[in-house]
């Protein structure tokens, strides 16, 4: 299961934090001050890599750009250690962390089992605040809860691929400019495919208690998903529909949601 023992990291440097995380696998690593990040020439430096059996607890602190650097790393936090090459990651997560840095994705999950992404504030990503992608396989058994995501260039929470047993709960999203505030999609690596040829897709996902507002696409968009349970969400003020269950959606459940002042056009924006 997830780790329970806490150890504090007292530094500020992102590369030093990565080494500390690897030295303290099996623990909750709690920050005591903001972390300074930057993009090195090889591209991987500046990305926080959380190993398996480890949680990064921001403890209310932030990721900020290091003085003298202007280019952000591609990603803020990944639940993966590049040099280990172990997929899927297991029993890991990130919580209580904030950033306004314009990453491509603020938090990226490639393939993982039993993850926690909780109480983070993620603003200004050029793509997604939280991206669960399928380049290396599926993610199962995850909690995405209590995050605040604003002003992203694509989907605020993106679940792309054959992922399952996820709880997307009590997140607050505004100003997403992509498909939707929350997108649950069988599109492989974000690419358009023929949904009627697909035999896999995101499934057994609960979307509950979220507030999604002011999006350029739909508030909630599903394509090729099955057994998605959508309850007690507030979906409002989006340019397109409040909710779109698009091609290939089977056996989804939608009840007790408040859908207010959205557009009537549907499908993909643009």
Feature locations, PLM:
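Acidic Gly/Asp/Thr-rich repetitive segments characteristic of extracellular carbohydrate-active
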Residues: 1-32, 37
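Extracellular beta-strand-rich solenoid/capping regions of secreted or surface-exposed proteins
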Residues: 22-24, 36-55, 64-95, 101-113, ...
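Solenoid scaffold repeats with emphasis on beta-solenoid/beta-helix
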Residues: 29, 35, 48, 54-56, ...
